[in-house]
Regions:
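Bacterial N-terminal signal peptides
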Residues: 18-28
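Sec/Tat signal peptide C-region and signal peptidase I cleavage site
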Residues: 29-34
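Beta-strand cores of secreted/periplasmic/IMS beta-sandwich domains, seen most often
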Residues: 60-67, 94-122, 156-164, 168, ...
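N-terminal edge beta-strand
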Residues: 67-105
Length: 189
């Protein structure tokens, strides 16, 4: 396959993902989301978002963020400025692998800074590849669908997870997002 055909195929995936998202939103389809939009989302200004980001308790080494202790705090953001769409960022690393102790309580803060889309930060044992219209089950913890940020503010929410040892994945279940790379791995040991 020549380069031009590869580019057309790649662009076609984004078009299909976008059309799927529009169709799902228009028809009110929620099967792609872990849970429906809820009221636990709070709003934050950019300075407040920056203050939230520094609360992550992990240490970065390459493409891995390692956590230690009985309680860890993971702060993930969707599409921070300077990062490609769609992606998660943790400690300024795109879709890093998270290394978490099995006996830890994991407090997660998820921030949506992407003004054009809602996102989700959901945890599953199902690994990639992911479909354009995902129906990833089971979701063991997560945020569900976020509101689209408006009025110069960003949305964020928190949840707590008590994992057992194993391999998990954090994913965005908005149609097309995980299929085009908005996911990462979690190793709990």
């Amino acid at each position: 396959m020549n380069t031009q055909n590869k580019v057309k195929m790649h662009n076609g995936r984004y078009v299909a993902a976008g059309l799927s998202a529009i169709l799902a939103a228009t028809l009110g389809i929620t099967t792609a989301m872990a849970t429906p939009l809820d009221t636990s989302w709070k709003s934050a200004t950019l300075p407040q978002v920056k203050a939230l980001l520094v609360k992550d308790s992990g240490k970065v080494s390459g493409k891995m963020v390692t956590y230690s202790g009985k309680t860890v705090h993971v702060v993930a953001a969707a599409v921070l400025p300077g990062f490609p769409f769609p992606s998660f960022e943790i400690h300024d690393v795109k879709n890093p692998t998270l290394d978490i102790p099995a006996d830890a309580t994991v407090d997660v803060t998820f921030i949506n800074t992407n003004k054009g889309f809602g996102h989700s930060f959901d945890i599953t044992k199902k690994g990639p590849p992911y479909a354009v219209m995902p129906n990833i089950k089971p979701i063991v913890a997560g945020t569900g669908f976020s509101p689209v940020p408006k009025g110069g503010k960003f949305g964020y929410t928190d949840f707590t997870w008590h994992p057992t040892a194993g391999t998990y994945y954090y994913v965005c279940q908005i149609p097309g997002h995980a299929a085009t790379g908005m996911f990462g791995k979690i190793v709990v040991k």
